[in-house]
Each structure stands twice: as structure tokens, then as C-alpha cells.
From Swiss-Prot:
<dbReference type="InterPro" id="IPR036890">
    <property type="entry name" value="HATPase_C_sf"/>
</dbReference>
<dbReference type="GO" id="GO:0016887">
    <property type="term" value="F:ATP hydrolysis activity"/>
</dbReference>
<feature type="region of interest" description="Interaction with TP53">
    <location>
        <begin position="1"/>
        <end position="527"/>
    </location>
</feature>
<dbReference type="GO" id="GO:0042470">
    <property type="term" value="C:melanosome"/>
</dbReference>
<feature type="region of interest" description="Interaction with NR3C1">
    <location>
        <begin position="9"/>
        <end position="231"/>
    </location>
</feature>
<dbReference type="Pfam" id="PF00183">
    <property type="entry name" value="HSP90"/>
</dbReference>
<keyword id="KW-0067">ATP-binding</keyword>
<dbReference type="GO" id="GO:0051726">
    <property type="term" value="P:regulation of cell cycle"/>
</dbReference>
<feature type="glycosylation site" description="O-linked (GlcNAc) serine">
    <location>
        <position position="434"/>
    </location>
</feature>
<feature type="region of interest" description="Interaction with BIRC2">
    <location>
        <begin position="1"/>
        <end position="214"/>
    </location>
</feature>
<dbReference type="GO" id="GO:0051082">
    <property type="term" value="F:unfolded protein binding"/>
</dbReference>
<dbReference type="GO" id="GO:0032435">
    <property type="term" value="P:negative regulation of proteasomal ubiquitin-dependent protein catabolic process"/>
</dbReference>
<feature type="modified residue" description="Phosphothreonine">
    <location>
        <position position="479"/>
    </location>
</feature>
<feature type="compositionally biased region" description="Acidic residues">
    <location>
        <begin position="225"/>
        <end position="244"/>
    </location>
</feature>
<feature type="region of interest" description="Interaction with NR3C1">
    <location>
        <begin position="264"/>
        <end position="608"/>
    </location>
</feature>
<feature type="binding site">
    <location>
        <position position="392"/>
    </location>
    <ligand>
        <name>ATP</name>
    </ligand>
</feature>
<feature type="modified residue" description="Phosphoserine">
    <location>
        <position position="255"/>
    </location>
</feature>
């Protein structure tokens, strides 16, 4: 609960900062940062946002601006008081806003930003996490915020960052509407009161803000007045308080006298020095997107990108274009160098593309302007055709916006293709945003082909470099009809998988897909450049064969037919069928899935979903096929034992052990890992020559049962010793 202190009639309430905010402020105050200047960028950016909000509200209700028509930002240094003041005529804050926004409710980015800072991130990232206001404490020992919202009285917020802040009704000079932030600067930060320094920082970070930023400075100038006026002013000056700085200082700096012989004898004049307030607009640059791209330097694009996004790094690529004809709009699109920390967070406020109508800012969170998978693109769209007072509901129905969106997507894909020609930069882009491209393939059927050309993967022949599907196709053998791929958790895991043995041995290249989103991507990407994509982990893998190989395969099928039937009987519903494999070389067996079922990797991903649909799990997971390698000695010996006695318990035990091991090596998980472990331990004992009966006699009280229950529930113990 806030403490209340009464000063006469004035009520001051004291609140404690929310714990994470207090921690952040402590970090800002007690750590040395070299680029403290970013505080000014953050405060100007906040002022600009407040102005955007009131202007947007005024589009539907012009009376909102009755409390002040002019939308502007003023910067007022006061060296005598050691204060730097920023005033905006934005929407202002109510008392509740003031308490919530400046201290008692932590933004989602507070903790994330502190973690980033402690991991070595730059302080200038603060704006991206939504806590830019607190950067004021980089230079200020005390901050006072005076604010007036149309729906509330004028209030003052004050804090010296000691873990608490105060809020009171403010009866000082009325500000009409908006917010005034007064920074009481630290003794060593007075450089931010100098004209040169303020101009430098505003030019560097905020020259493209869409509202006039005016610097108010007290300056001196010489003024020429007649001798009589000078005497009068001098007399007045002496009568008044010497410290009054509003009146001009009078200095005799020379006089002009005319010759007495002149016809019109002029009065004597004197020059005096007077103090005045100079107003200078610091951001007269017109919106960069309205200019000709040929006249804009890369540095200007970089500065605009930083002021637009609060990023501390330059952009990776830029696309500046205009569309004319039936529809007219201009756009400026940027690709950042890195993905933001909350790129795929559902609840995050989207502010990637700012929508303007005829240079008037409308909104910065327009979902209809760009598809979800391009949510990392930053920039500006300025339409000539949309109405100024357009609402969100109207935007959803707007045909104009649909055409703009289509053009933006087209230009983004052009930009990606241009970037792909620069291998180094494309590698950075792909590391940051490959998931977005794959999400696009899943969601955007219209542009699926163009997006697929941008994909890059490691393959069995690409070494450390990634390769495109186009390059893969160019290397395909004459007899090869399909693009072979495998999905899994890591490059090492899939490269050593049993599934790729035969394919690689035959000299065919295999694409390694190791991100969870690849599973969704290939479900939609059925083919590329006329070549179908075939998973080497699914049934029906057809490799080009000559007549001799076909004949050998038919012989193997006939030879192992009885073993396949027996294994199917033993495993029953665990597998759909047991067949001879054409994909194995050194492994005895593997588990493949049906053509339309999930792969082992997809099953793992789906099991990890907290909100999964169990009804889907049932029919998508069920179809497993066991493939055995007819050339492997284990399988051949098992065939001989089965033919000698198909009721041999050891055969049953071995079949299940082979199946469970194949499940693991194929990427699946076991339903009952304990029973499998016990079987393995028993084999280890046999291998070491340990007699189970002796062990059981020595440990009569052991909690573990003396014998592992046989596989089929038979009461007789399994005779695995015979196999050993």
C-alpha cells in the first residue's frame, strides 16, 4: 500500500518500485556505461509514441486536440539549475498510468533485458525491451515527470531511484496536455546541457522523428538603441535586482556621432547585450521514404533504421520502393542483423511496420500489412489511397491494404534473393531468420516455390557449408529421380543414422534437416524443381536398381519370408509389418514409418507439445514397419534358429530386443524402458559369466525380482544363455 504524506492540502503518495524494476535501476545506476547518450533517444522516442497516440485518437475525435493543437517535442537545458527538460504535447498519462507505467508493473522485457545486460549486451538495446524510460538514470540523479491527460488532472511523479517514487497532484504551471520530463543531472553529466552535445545526439539518434524537436537555448545578442533609451534602461537596471537575468545587460560598446555640420543631426546610439531564448528545430529533414532512393546514402538509411527500431546495430539489407498506378504507396523495408529475443512470442505487441497515410502516422501494429512469417521485417509504408481516419476494423476489410500486403511480400522475397547473392551476409540472415522462411513455406502456398529457393541445408556431400536445393538438383545422378532427406535432432545424429547407409553407399546425396520446423516445412514442400522430396526414414524408399540387384532382392524376400512372418507374430500390434530392407548396410534392422504418418523426429516433437491433441497422436503414431537387413549376420543366424525351432523362447526374446534397439536407433522412444534395461543388464551378466541364481541366493531381500518376466508372459525363464 502507498504511504500518504500530507503537506498542507497537498497529498503525496509513496510507492515501492516493483522488484525487477528496482533491480534494473540499480544495475543502470551502479554500472559504468560509456554510451550514456542513448537516454535522450529513449525519451524522445517515448515522446514520439505519445504524440502518435493523441494524433491517432484525434483522427476519429478532433476535440481531443482542443487541449493543444500543436504536436511537438521541446528540449530545454538549464545550466543554472543543472536540469534538462523534455516536453511533449502527446497523450499524457492519467494518475493510474503514471503509477503502473513508471514503476509498479514490470514489462515483460525487464527481466529479459537484465539477463541480456549481464550476458554482455549493449545498454543501447534498452528500448527494444520496452524499458527505455529508466535509461534517464544513466545521467540523472533525480527525475521528475509532470503529466496531463485529457481525462485526468495534472500529476507529478518523482524519484531519486532509492527503491521508491512519489506521486502527487501538481498545481504548478499548467502544461495543457502531454508530459514534461525534468532530469536533475549528475555533476559529471553536464555535457548534456551544451548546445553542441544535444544537437549531436539528436542528429545521431532522432533526426527522423516525425514531429518537430525544438531546442530552447538562452543566448546573448547585441542590440543597438539610442543613447536616451540606453540611459533609461540603465537606470531601470540599477533599480531592479542585480540577479534578474531576464533584463538586458547594458554595456557601452561604442557610440556613433554625426558631424555637427550635417543637416539632420542624429541622436547618439549605443550597443547593448541582451539575453533571449533561441528556438532551433533540430530535425528539419523531410521523411526519408519520400525522397528519391538515388539521393540517399547508406549512412542515412542506417541512421533512419536506428531511429525507427532503437537497434544499436546497422541493418543487414534495405529495400526502398514506390508503387504507382491504380494504387499509390511508398515503402522502406529493412532486414535487421539479428532476431529479437521475442520473435515468435504470441502476445508481443507487433510494431515491425509503421503505417502512414499521406505522411500522417496511423499505427505501428498493423497485422494486415505483412504475414506472420515476415514479422522480423522493419520499416515504413506510406499510402496515398487509404482514408486518414481508418479504423482497425476497416483495415481488415480494406482491398487497398490487401494489394499493399501482396506487394510488400513480393519485394521482401526480391530482397532475400538479392541478399542470397552475398554468401557472407546471407549466412548471417539465414542463421537469424531461417525459421521464418520455413514457416512461410508451411503457410504461404502462393510463394512456396520462391521461398524454397532460399532454403539452405547441410547434406552428406556439403561438408561444413550449407547448400541450396537448386545446387543439390544440379549434382543429382542421371538415374536419380528424387531428392532424399532425413530429419533428426542434429547433423551428427542424422549423418550416422542407419537410414542413410545404403543411399550414401550408392553415391546419392542426402539432405540433413535438423530443426523441428523442417518437419512442418517438408509436409507442404512435396517437390522442388520437378523432383519429389523423399524421406529415407519412411516406407517405400525406391533406389535405382539394376536387374542383378532386383533379382537378389527377390531371392532375399523368399529366403526370409518365414522369419518376417514369425517376427510379425511375436511383435503383433507393435508393428504393422516386417519386411526386407533395401536401405541398410551395416545395421541389422530399422523402424520406418508409413508414407503419411509421422517420422520418429515428428513423433518426438509432438510428444513434447504441452497442449497436444491426443486423438491425433493415436492414428499418426501407429504405423511402424520393421525392416531387416538380409545381409547382416545377426539376422541370418536368427533365421537359422527360427527355422530350427520357431517356438524357441530365445528367438522371441531376441526379436523383441532387436525391435526395441531398432526403435532407439531409429529415433523413437520406448514405452517401457525399464524392461528393456533389465534385458540388457541380463545380457551383460551372461557376457560376464555371472550366474543369476547365485546372485539371487546372495541377495534374498533384494527388491528387484529374481527373474525378468519373459516377453510373452510365459512362466518359463527365457533361455538366452543358449544364444550367448
Amino acid at each position: 500500500m502507498p504511504e500518504e504524506v500530507h503537506h498542507g492540502e497537498e497529498e503525496v503518495e509513496t510507492f515501492a518500485f516493483q522488484a525487477e524494476i528496482a533491480q534494473l535501476m540499480s544495475l543502470i545506476i551502479n554500472t559504468f556505461y560509456s554510451n550514456k547518450e542513448i537516454f535522450l533517444r529513449e525519451l524522445i522516442s517515448n515522446a514520439s509514441d505519445a504524440l502518435d497516440k493523441i494524433r491517432y485518437e484525434s483522427l476519429t475525435d478532433p476535440s481531443k486536440l482542443d487541449s493543444g493543437k500543436e504536436l511537438k517535442i521541446d528540449i530545454i537545458p538549464n545550466p543554472q539549475e543543472r536540469t534538462l527538460t523534455l516536453v511533449d504535447t502527446g497523450i499524457g498519462m492519467t494518475k493510474a498510468d503514471l503509477i503502473n507505467n513508471l514503476g509498479t508493473i514490470a514489462k515483460s522485457g525487464t527481466k529479459a533485458f537484465m539477463e541480456a545486460l549481464q550476458a554482455g549486451a549493449d545498454i543501447s538495446m534498452i528500448g527494444q525491451f520496452g524499458v527505455g524510460f529508466y535509461s534517464a538514470y544513466l545521467v540523472a540523479e533525480k527525475v521528475v515527470v509532470i503529466t496531463k491527460h485529457n481525462d485526468d488532472e495534472q500529476y507529478a511523479w518523482e524519484s531519486s531511484a532509492g527503491g521508491s517514487f512519489t506521486v502527487r497532484a501538481d498545481h504548478g504551471e499548467p502544461i495543457g496536455r502531454g508530459t514534461k520530463v525534468i532530469l536533475h543531472l549528475k555533476e559529471d553529466q553536464t555535457e548534456y546541457l551544451e548546445e553542441r552535445r544535444v544537437k549531436e545526439v539528436v542528429k545521431k539518434h532522432s533526426q527522423f522523428i516525425g514531429y518537430p524537436i525544438t531546442l530552447y537555448l538562452e543566448k546573448e545578442r547585441e542590440k543597438e538603441i539610442s543613447d536616451d533609451e540606453a540611459e533609461e534602461e540603465k537606470g531601470e537596471k540599477e533599480e531592479e535586482d542585480k540577479d534578474d537575468e531576464e533584463k538586458p545587460k547594458i554595456e557601452d560598446v561604442g557610440s556613433d556621432e554625426e558631424d555637427d555640420s550635417g543637416k539632420d543631426k542624429k541622436k547618439k546610439t549605443k550597443k547593448i547585450k541582451e539575453k533571449y531564448i533561441d528556438q532551433e528545430e533540430l530535425n528539419k529533414t523531410k521523411p526519408i521514404w519520400t525522397r528519391n532512393p538515388d539521393d540517399i546514402t547508406q549512412e542515412e538509411y542506417g541512421e533512419f533504421y536506428k531511429s525507427l527500431t532503437n537497434d544499436w546495430e546497422d541493418h543487414l539489407a534495405v529495400k526502398h520502393f514506390s508503387v504507382e498506378g491504380q494504387l499509390e504507396f511508398r515503402a522502406l523495408l529493412f532486414i535487421p542483423r539479428r532476431a529479437p529475443f521475442d520473435l515468435f512470442e504470441n502476445k508481443k505487441k507487433k510494431n515491425n511496420i509503421k503505417l502512414y497515410v499521406r505522411r500522417v502516422f496511423i499505427m505501428d501494429s498493423c497485422d494486415e500489412l505483412i504475414p506472420e512469417y515476415l514479422n522480423f521485417i522493419r520499416g515504413v509504408v506510406d499510402s496515398e489511397d487509404l482514408p486518414l481516419n481508418i479504423s482497425r476494423e476497416m483495415l481488415q476489410q480494406s482491398k487497398i491494404l490487401k494489394v499493399i500486403r501482396k506487394n510488400i511480400v513480393k519485394k521482401c522475397l526480391e530482397l532475400f534473393s538479392e541478399l542470397a547473392e552475398d554468401k557472407e551476409n546471407y549466412k548471417k540472415f539465414y542463421e537469424a531468420f531461417s525459421k521464418n522462411l520455413k514457416l512461410g513455406i508451411h503457410e504461404d502456398s502462393t510463394n512456396r516455390r520462391r521461398l524454397s529457393e532460399l532454403l539452405r541445408y547441410h547434406t552428406s556431400q556439403s561438408g561444413d557449408e550449407m547448400t541450396s536445393l537448386s545446387e543439390y538438383v544440379s549434382r543429382m545422378k542421371e538415374t536419380q529421380k528424387s531428392i532424399y532427406y532425413i530429419t533428426g535432432e542434429s547433423k551428427e545424429q542424422v549423418a550416422n543414422s542407419a537410414f542413410v547407409e545404403r543411399v550414401r553407399k550408392r553415391g546419392f546425396e542426402v539432405v540433413y534437416m535438423t530443426e523441428p520446423i523442417d518437419e512442418y516445412c517438408v509436409q507442404q514442400l512435396k517437390e522442388f524443381d520437378g523432383k519429389s522430396l523423399v524421406s529415407v526414414t519412411k516406407e517405400g524408399l525406391e533406389l535405382p536398381e539394376d536387374e542383378e540387384e532386383k533379382k537378389k532382392m527377390e531371392e532375399s524376400k523368399a529366403k526370409f519370408e518365414n522369419l518376417c512372418k514369425l517376427m510379425k507374430e511375436i511383435l503383433d500390434k507393435k508393428v504393422e509389418e516386417v519386411t526386407i530392407s533395401n536401405r541398410l548396410v551395416s545395421s541389422p534392422c530399422c523402424i520406418v514409418t508409413s508414407t503419411y504418418g509421422w517420422t520418429a523426429n515428428m513423433e518426438r516433437i509432438m510428444k513434447a507439445q504441452a497442449l497436444r491433441d491426443n486423438s491425433t497422436m493415436g492414428y499418426m503414431m501407429a504405423k511402424k514397419h520393421l525392416e531387416i537387413n538380409p545381409d547382416h549376420p545377426i539376422v541370418e543366424t536368427l533365421r537359422q534358429k527360427a527355422e530350427a525351432d520357431k517356438n524357441d523362447k530365445a528367438v522371441k526374446d531376441l526379436v523383441v530386443l532387436l525391435f526395441e534397439t531398432a526403435l532407439l536407433s531409429s529415433g523413437f522412444s520406448l514405452e517401457d524402458p525399464q524392461t528393456h534395461s533389465n534385458r540388457i543388464y541380463r545380457m551383460i551378466k551372461l557376457g560376464l559369466g555371472i550366474d543369476e541364481d547365485e546372485v539371487a541366493a546372495e541377495e534374498p531381500s533384494a527388491a528387484v525380482p529374481d527373474e525378468i518376466p519373459p516377453l510373452e508372459g510365459d512362466e518359463d525363464a527365457s533361455r538366452m544363455e543358449e544364444v550367448d
